[in-house]
A protein has these predicted regions:
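Conserved phosphate-binding/catalytic loops in two-lobed NTP-binding clefts
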Residues: 329-336, 457-458, 605-624
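Redox- and metal-dependent alpha/beta enzyme cores, enriched for Fe-S-associated oxidoreductases
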Residues: 6-27, 229-294
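Conserved phosphate-binding catalytic cores of ATP/NTP-utilizing and phosphoryl-transfer enzymes
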Residues: 368-375, 443-491, 576, 625-632
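Glycine-rich phosphate-binding/hydrolytic loop that grips phosphoryl groups
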Residues: 511, 615-635
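Glycine-rich phosphate-binding loops at beta-strand->alpha-helix junctions
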Residues: 443, 580, 584-607, 618-622
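Glycine-rich phosphate-binding loop plus the immediately following alpha-helix
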Residues: 410-413, 490-534
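Adenine-nucleotide phosphate-binding core of ATP-dependent small-molecule kinases
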Residues: 546-579, 619
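N-terminal glycine/serine-rich phosphate-binding loop of ATP-dependent small-molecule kinases
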Residues: 375-457, 596, 605-606, 610-612
Length: 635
């Protein structure tokens, strides 16, 4: 039978020993909505729980084993019991401690799980089967010596309930380390274990965390090394990293696949459950000092850390905050909602992060077209394919902008890019043969086949802002459907960034919607806000609710300039929160189409207490950065 699981504390090997075919559940990459889940679960239950619900109800599994790792998993179990009563649904209550009493309790609960599954599947568990499942072998004369190892559930419950139950110290697992990384892990874990013992109740002997069960680490001297941590991460994150020439040094997310348990012939189940419970602790465990020790060891050795979280999950936010303050390695906070729509946002963030740490080694189209790039050509082109506008810049060898165009993005990003390309070449008075290199950026960058390379808008805006004003350190870019804050160093290199591309609030589309409600043009909205005489607050951050709030203000006969000013302040407040996440450091620059809205500009300046630098055409900053990168590539 096919049984799913979502947590590393599930006794996968024991269930496989009893005949279950265990499948680690990840977010279905084809999933586009949570229609079934949201019909019987609260909207704010974490996205992974909803995705798991959809996966189980798809009919490909005979059951699932959940754990009490969080309230969302408990609510998921309730919903599954109601909607799929014929499936095997078991919630394993995992202790938050790892002391001897906790190990005994966990062993008893695993026994209850095995008993329940045995009845469901008409199967019988034995420690001999578990020993074999873990890789243990018996010599021929021992072939039948374990026939008495059928699990006595009543005896196990009785023993586990006694305070005197102990796991013999002489039977603790031992294994030689195969490399220096594992040895270093052992030292780090031992340090963490000692801290755990010092903090524990002295009347209870707390066993050390099993130092042989280390997360697998692999550091490559020839490739950028990036680690993955946090909540459950799907395979797409790894695929993107590996496609960009990155070595994944470690993966310690919830459902990482690193399971290495050493079989013990005596008391096989007791040793096994002890080992499962004393893995590298997750963030829900009482003592996470071994986890901190692991980070202390590996973070100085990697180029960056991708810290994954799931929408509406707050389990790992505290650890991320601590690592963000103390980590010697750059960290990317990556939140996904476990749907296929997350891929574009995930790709942009990961590529921008890799570019910022100098770790991106993409297989660009340029590598296939290298011979077609003319060494005698003297111009380069930068193309910024955004949601609202497509912008193009032609630059010469002297780093001078020869021509630029801004056109409306149509239904096809590729077609709009081709039109912008033709128009900018016409304005520059040159032919395609005179273009040495074309680099595309923006959300539509992957849909421009004639570009030699594509680079994220994060890197391009950083480079473009530095071109227009080298003193700029913090950039605010508000586009048609996203907004981002970028911090750059003195060389124009991105050091940190934060994005909002999951919600229309605080973007150009939001302002368009409000202008339509006020029956004025978008160009009139900003100047109208400057004429405000009354302070109005738009409380809702959601674009839909904000529009309803604006309609209510109109019904109350409030003046259009006052409403416009309130909307501009709401947009500025959302932008300011992004800027604070990357660090407020002057000089400040604003780019994107919204930089032409004087109402929003004034509201942002009031919040930061400083003037914003805005270039003559703020919409071409990204395309200018792309052209600069193209110039570097063609040299």
């Amino acid at each position: 039978m096919r049984i799913g699981y979502v947590c590393k504390y599930v006794p996968v090997e024991a269930l496989e020993a009893i005949g279950a075919h265990m499948e680690r559940i990840e977010a279905d990459e084809s999933l586009v909505s949570f229609d079934a889940a949201e019909s019987c679960m609260h909207a704010n239950v974490c996205s992974f729980a909803k995705a798991t619900f959809e996966t189980v109800l798809s009919g490909n599994l005979d059951g699932i084993v959940l754990t009490t790792c969080c309230d969302s998993m408990r609510r998921l179990a309730d919903a599954l019991h109601a909607q799929a009563p014929n499936l095997f649904i078991h919630v394993l209550d995992v202790p938050r401690d790892t002391g001897e009493a906790a190990c005994a309790l966990y062993q008893r609960r695993v026994a209850e799980l095995l008993s329940a599954y045995g009845k469901f599947a008409n199967a019988t568990f034995s420690e001999k089967k578990l020993f074999a499942q873990l890789g243990g072998t018996l010599c021929p004369e021992e072939g039948n010596c374990d026939s008495s190892l059928e699990l006595d559930y009543a005896r196990l419950h009785s023993e586990a309930a006694q305070p005197s139950f102990r796991l013999a110290k002489s039977s603790s697992v031992s294994q030689s380390f195969t490399n220096s990384n594992q040895a270093a892990d052992s030292a780090a874990w031992s340090e963490g274990c000692e801290a755990s013992e010092r903090n524990a109740d002295e009347t209870v002997a707390v066993p050390q965390v099993n130092c042989t069960l280390q997360p697998q680490t692999h550091f490559s001297p020839a490739m950028p090394n990036v680690g993955i941590a946090g909540a459950r991460a799907n395979a797409e994150i790894k695929r993107i990293l590996e496609t960009h020439g990155v070595n994944i040094a470690f993966d310690i997310t919830c459902t990482n696949a690193s399971r290495r348990f050493v079989p013990q012939k005596a008391d096989t189940l007791a040793h096994y459950t002890h080992d499962v419970l004393t893995q590298l602790p997750c963030a829900r465990m009482r003592d996470i000092s071994p986890r901190k020790a692991f980070f202390d060891r590996v973070l100085p050795q990697i180029d960056g850390l991708v810290y994954h979280t799931v929408q509406f999950c707050d389990m790992y936010s505290y650890e991320y905050g601590d690592l963000k303050r103390t980590s010697p390695a750059p960290i990317l906070a990556l939140e996904t909602d476990c749907t296929a729509q997350s891929r574009g946002q995930m790709l942009t963030r990961l590529e921008a992060f890799l570019e910022s740490i100098g770790a991106s080694q993409k297989e660009h189209l340029a590598s296939q077209k290298g011979s077609s790039m003319s060494k005698t050509a003297t111009f380069v082109v930068g193309l910024d394919s955004g949601s609202t506008s497509t912008n193009a810049v032609v630059m010469n060898e002297a780093r001078e902008i020869v021509a630029s165009v801004v056109i409306r993005t149509g239904a096809k990003a590729g077609a709009s890019a081709e039109r912008a390309y033709r128009e900018v070449l016409e304005r520059a008075g040159i032919t395609p043969d005179q273009v040495a290199c074309t680099i595309a950026t923006g959300y539509g960058r992957v849909s421009i086949p004639f570009a030699d390379e594509n680079v994220t808008e994060i890197s391009c805006h950083g480079r473009g802002a530095h071109y227009f004003n080298p003193a700029v350190r913090t950039i605010l870019d508000i586009g048609g459907q996203d907004s981002k804050a970028i911090h750059v160093n003195a060389a124009g290199e991105v050091t940190d960034f934060a994005m909002n591309d999951k919600c229309a609030a605080g973007t150009g589309r939001f302002l368009e919607m409000i202008a339509r409600s006020l029956e004025i043009s978008l160009d009139e909205l900003g100047p109208a806000a400057l004429e405000s005489k009354k302070h109005l607050e738009i409380a809702s951050m959601c674009s839909v609710f904000a529009e309803s709030e604006v309609i209510s203000l109109i019904a109350n006969n409030e003046e259009k300039p006052d409403i416009a000013a309130g909307v501009c302040r709401a947009v500025a407040g959302k932008a300011y929160s992004l800027m604070r996440r990357v660090g407020l450091e002057g000089a400040y620059m604003m780019t994107g189409g919204v930089a032409q809205n004087p109402g929003v500009v004034r509201a942002v300046e009031e919040l930061i207490g400083e003037k914003l630098f805005i270039c003559e055409d703020p919409e071409i900053v990204g395309a200018t950065g792309a052209a600069l990168l193209a110039l570097e590539k063609s040299e």
